[in-house]
Amino acid sequence: MHSEAEESKEVATDVFNSKNLAVQAQKKILGKMVSKSIATTLIDDTSSEVLDELYRVTREYTQNKKEAEKIIKNLIKTVIKLAILYRNNQFNQDELALMEKFKKKVHQLAMTVVSFHQVDYTFDRNVLSRLLNECREMLHQIIRRHLTAKSHGRVNNVFDHFSDCDFLAALYNPFGNFKPHLQKLCDGINKMLDEENI
């Protein structure tokens, strides 16, 4: 049998927990809404087309729908988290300087991807792989203080796939199955370059 004091304590605890749960639910919903609004501003139509094409080529190359979805989801999550950190001024001066280098490296990567497609006999999978791995290393340094080991794992999952020399060779094979995908990817990347979105 409980005393009145114990019962009122339990009731107060129940109320506190209920309110706490409600606040947590609100935060979760608000967090999703904020993430969704940021995602829609970050991932415009052109970016979305490029991501869709990356998904299609990855799915076709891996012959694994689940793995392709995971790689693209990890790419999107990484981009959004990076943007949230950047927009909320979470980076120190060193990280901001590294972020500027990273943006330039991604721009160089995009130009190289398109150039290798447009100019016959220039493709070099080792050059692309090296550029991708340089981007990976910079990204790890930028997010080191801010994101979890799980996020670093996502970065590795994305870059392990896209920097794989066999994948790149298959993608750029002029007689291979991926030629239409590469054309669409390069069209989208070119548009992003023209719009200064990359």
Swiss-Prot record:
Residues 49-83 form a coiled coil. GO terms for biological process: apoptotic process; positive regulation of apoptotic process. One of its GO terms (cellular component) is cytoplasm. The gene is TNFAIP8. This is Tumor necrosis factor alpha-induced protein 8. It is found in: Cytoplasm. InterPro entries: TNFAIP8-like (IPR008477), TNFAIP8_sf (IPR038355). Its main location: cytoplasm.
